[in-house]
Amino acid sequence: MNKKILVLGGGVAGASMAYYLTEKGYDVTILEKNSKIGGLARTCYYSGHPYEFGPHIWFWPGGTEAPINATVVKLTNDELFYIDRRLLTYVESDQRAYRYPVHYADVARMPERETIERELRQNRDGQLKLIESQLPEIGQCKFAEYFTAAIGATLYDKFMANYTWKMWNIPGDELETSMVWADRFSAATETGGAPTTTKVSGYDPLKFDDHTLGKGIRFQVYPKGGWNSVWDAMVTRSAIVRDTILGIQDEHRKPYVATASGTKYYFGDYHTVFSSIDIDRLWGEDTLPYTGRMMVPLLIPGLACAFPNGAESVHYSSCEFQTRVTEMKVITRHESPDTMLLIEIPILPGAAKVFPKNTLDYAIEHNLFAEKAYPQQSEQAFATYYGYVDRCKKIPNLRMVGRHAEFKYWGMAETVNSAYQKSLDFEAV
């Protein structure tokens, strides 16, 4: 039996795929362009302060017995911080911060509270529960359409309209709900299983009890030593080749993966080839739309704590450049008399051209800059994506894994779960 597996890309998806298949006895080779494994989830350091490309808190239902949670426990020797997230939104027009996500109790503090109360009741019953029959269907409507119906025009404008636009570079009345929410809703329950986008309905963005991201999920953690030991441990039994993938060549006759070094990796030599890179880049093309992120690490000397009451992040809902600012030591528990804020700024393709080369090289090397971070899942983009999927099917032993290859708005846990689910198709050898 051919036990050889080729994995394209050594980010979270590629490392996870390699881990689950080497656990079953397969011989795995990883092609990765960077010097280190883990992609944008790798822990980097600025003046000794650990950070990732935005906060990388792991949360997944099922507790420590869930298979992918058990993987994290095993690879960290259970050296984990359990996280209770405190998040805020700053509304510039109100000159005030509110809890994130939107809480009903905070409406009383808002200047337009009477209008908001009236709008909230348009699609709710006497107990302020959403009336599902009056709501648009998530996945079949625009973002603005659903959330205006759910919380009213005033709250939508205050918290979501500009934030969503700057995050995706798509106005809410053009943004598909399938793009932003559906990929991740089903994972945020205690039922577990593979993420799915089906039958999402009745989601209420307004919270009536004290709520935060991941609340109620038992396994919400950050490794005490950062994420690097996890990704490194995942690939200890794999062969890692540092090379840049140029794309698939000779697809109709004898397909192979071409690389910058000149080495050709023929599909016929492998049991399976898993690609975790952008599916358009797999074919040497650049057609799928993404928004990117620039991270600015701002170290404040002599200030031990910047945000009130142990808050982790502040979201900025207006037209400021930044979407979110995170005080990383709240997550990492790094001990220092100084604090470091990680400022997230959306960027568009071509942004790299406007920065000095030395700063850009530093940013890319230290996970502070990525032009392709979040897929823009418009109807046109999906059509392009599924065109690539059909093209990939012509190579029988080629499979996709992870958020980039599968064109999903997934977090870290959903990505690892994608690899785990695919590994179940393989018998131990």
Write out the residue ranges for each language-model feature.
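Conserved Rossmann-like nucleotide-cofactor binding loop
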Residues: A13, K36, D280
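Glycine-rich FAD pyrophosphate-binding loop
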Residues: T22-Y45
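Short catalytic/ligand-binding loop motif for oxyanion handling, primarily in non-cytosolic enzymes
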Residues: G38-L40, T89-V91, Y98-Y100, L155-Y156, ...
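Dinucleotide-binding Rossmann-like beta1-alpha1 core, especially the glycine-rich loop
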Residues: S47-Q134
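Active-site/ligand-binding neighborhood in enzyme catalytic cores
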Residues: R124-Y265, D269
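C-terminal catalytic lobe of FAD-dependent flavoproteins
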Residues: F369-V429
